[in-house]
Amino acid sequence: DRLIQGHSLEGERCFVVGEKPRSGLIHEQPESRPKTACNYDYIASIWPQLDWYLEGGDFYVGVQTKRGCPHNCCYCVYTVVEGKQVRLNPVDEVVKEMRQLYDRGVRGFWFTDAQFIPARRYIEDAKELLRAIKAEGLTGIRWAAYIRADNLDPELAQLMVETGMSYFEIGITSGSQELVRKMRMGYNLRTVLESCRMLADAGFRDHVSVNYSFNVIDERPETIRQTVAYHRELEAIFGADPVS
């Protein structure tokens, strides 16, 4: 509200990228230290309610496979919270954490990364992780993640389906390529549709959550119509019911 009204942010607990840090605020660069698996036996020892929390099973438990996001989307804080450098968590540690949860009855996993596949150069890393999940014998699981759907190839799409991806979120934001460019999102909307077709061809038939942000920079009736038309394209690929 203060920005919209043209007021200063001097008294707020935030900073503006590019400006010199103000006295009294803590500015810390993200560490690149490898993240080891959570020790759920220890967590259970200090939190007796853990097993009660995990009962039921109709939910996802978060597991992080990487930190950071290399992109420059104008509205997103992930580059401030986690940094722009992508730090991959060791595959064996990710699988070890999933195994602990699996043995406690968990079958739903949410990969809490800012982006599960942040750029095309991380496609092979995603494949390595999914192959390791298969090799570990974590059968009957379902997993979900926030993905940039422009970073797929047919083999990765097949692995995602085979290992139990049951839900994914994509931040389309707008069906107007003009507005996507102005928000510095760095992807081509046609490429996203091609990747979605790869997932459908691989057998994905589950839920797709599409994030839109109306009234963004230079939004107008024409661009809203483009967004509605784009959503219809996604429905044509996955079906109307799974896409929301």
For each of these PLM feature ranges, what is it?
Residues 1-97:
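Acidic, low-complexity intrinsically disordered segments
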Residues 9-11, 71, 119-121, 178-183, ...:
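Flexible glycine/acidic-rich beta-alpha junction loops that bind and position SAM and/or redox cofactors
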Residues 66, 84-87, 146, 185, ...:
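Hydrophobic alpha-helical scaffolding
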Residues 1-11, 159-167, 228-244:
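Structural recognition of alpha->loop->beta junctions
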Residues 7, 80, 113, 172, ...:
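Residues that line or immediately flank small-molecule/substrate-binding pockets and catalytic motifs
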Residues 91-209, 214-217:
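Conserved SAM/AdoMet-binding glycine-rich loop
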Residues 156, 218-233:
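Catalytic cores of alpha/beta
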